C-alpha cells in the first residue's frame, strides 16, 4: 500500500496577507488586496496578423513598448501589485477606475460586465499544482474589445501555456478570430483546470477513506478539517464561474 502524506495544512494555497480597503474609501480607489508574488510587472505582448504570430516579452512592463497587431492583440499583464502601473494601462486603453478596482481586488466572486464597446470578466482559477501538491487559487481578469484582449494576473504561472502553444503551432481557429473568441478560449481553459482539480479532490477523498480504515492517527481530524474548508471554497467558486460564463454566452451567442 502506498504511503500517504500527512497533510495537516490546507490543500489550497491561500492568501495569508489580505489587504482590506479602509471603510469609506471612495469608489475607484486602487488598492491591491492580494499577496505580491512577482518582483515587478511584466507583459507578454502577442500580435496576430493573419497567419503571422509574434510573441514579444516585455520584461520590465514598459507601456511605451507595447505593440498592437493588425488583426488582434493579446496583452498578458503579469503582476498587478503596482496600482500606478495598472492605472497607466487603464488610461491607455480606456479602462475605467471601477473596473481597475475590481482587477486589484483579488478576493471577489466571478463577474461579467458588458461595457458597451468593451467587456470585462473576472474569475477565480483553481488548478492542481503538482509541485506543491495543492490546489492553487489565482484571480484572472480579462478586458477585451474588438481589437485587443488584456489579461491581468499576479502570479507568473503557466496558466496560459496551452493557449500560447496553440498560437505558436499555427492554430488557424485563432488566426481569423477576434479577442472575444480568445477570451472564450481562456475561460474554457479555466474550466478544464477546474476538472483537473476535481480529480485531485477525488484522489484525496480516497486517501482519507484508506487512512480512516487502516491508519487513523492524531492528525486525521485536523487533516479532514482543512480538507473540508478547502472543498467548500472550491464548491463556492463553481456556481459563480458558471454565472459569469452564462452572461458571456448570452451576450455573444454568435461565437459561443
Describe these PLM feature segments:
Residues 1-255:
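Peripheral, non-transmembrane regulatory/ligand-interaction domains of membrane transport proteins
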Amino acid at each position: 500500500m502506498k504511503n500517504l502524506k500527512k497533510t495537516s495544512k490546507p490543500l489550497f494555497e491561500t492568501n495569508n496577507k489580505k489587504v482590506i480597503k479602509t471603510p469609506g474609501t471612495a469608489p475607484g480607489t486602487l488598492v491591491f488586496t492580494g499577496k505580491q508574488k512577482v518582483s515587478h510587472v511584466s507583459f507578454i505582448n502577442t500580435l496576430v496578423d493573419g497567419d503571422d504570430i509574434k510573441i514579444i516579452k516585455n520584461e520590465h512592463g514598459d507601456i511605451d513598448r507595447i505593440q498592437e497587431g493588425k488583426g488582434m492583440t493579446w496583452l498578458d499583464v503579469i503582476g498587478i501589485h503596482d496600482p500606478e502601473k495598472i492605472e497607466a494601462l487603464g488610461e491607455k486603453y480606456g479602462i475605467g477606475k471601477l473596473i481597475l478596482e475590481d482587477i486589484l481586488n483579488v478576493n471577489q466572486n466571478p463577474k461579467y460586465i458588458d461595457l458597451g464597446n468593451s467587456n470585462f470578466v473576472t474569475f477565480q482559477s483553481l488548478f492542481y499544482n503538482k509541485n506543491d501538491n495543492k490546489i492553487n487559487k489565482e484571480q484572472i481578469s480579462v478586458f477585451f474589445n474588438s481589437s485587443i484582449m488584456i489579461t491581468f494576473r499576479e502570479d507568473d504561472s503557466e496558466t496560459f501555456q496551452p493557449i500560447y502553444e496553440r498560437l505558436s503551432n499555427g492554430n488557424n481557429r485563432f488566426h481569423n478570430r477576434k479577442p472575444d473568441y480568445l477570451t472564450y478560449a481562456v475561460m474554457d481553459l479555466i474550466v478544464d483546470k477546474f476538472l483537473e482539480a476535481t480529480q485531485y479532490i477525488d484522489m484525496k477523498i480516497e486517501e482519507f477513506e484508506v487512512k480512516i480504515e487502516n491508519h487513523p492517527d492524531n492528525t486525521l481530524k485536523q487533516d479532514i478539517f482543512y480538507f473540508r474548508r478547502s472543498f467548500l471554497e472550491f464548491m463556492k467558486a463553481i456556481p459563480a464561474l458558471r454565472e459569469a460564463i452564462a452572461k458571456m454566452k448570452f451576450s455573444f451567442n454568435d461565437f459561443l
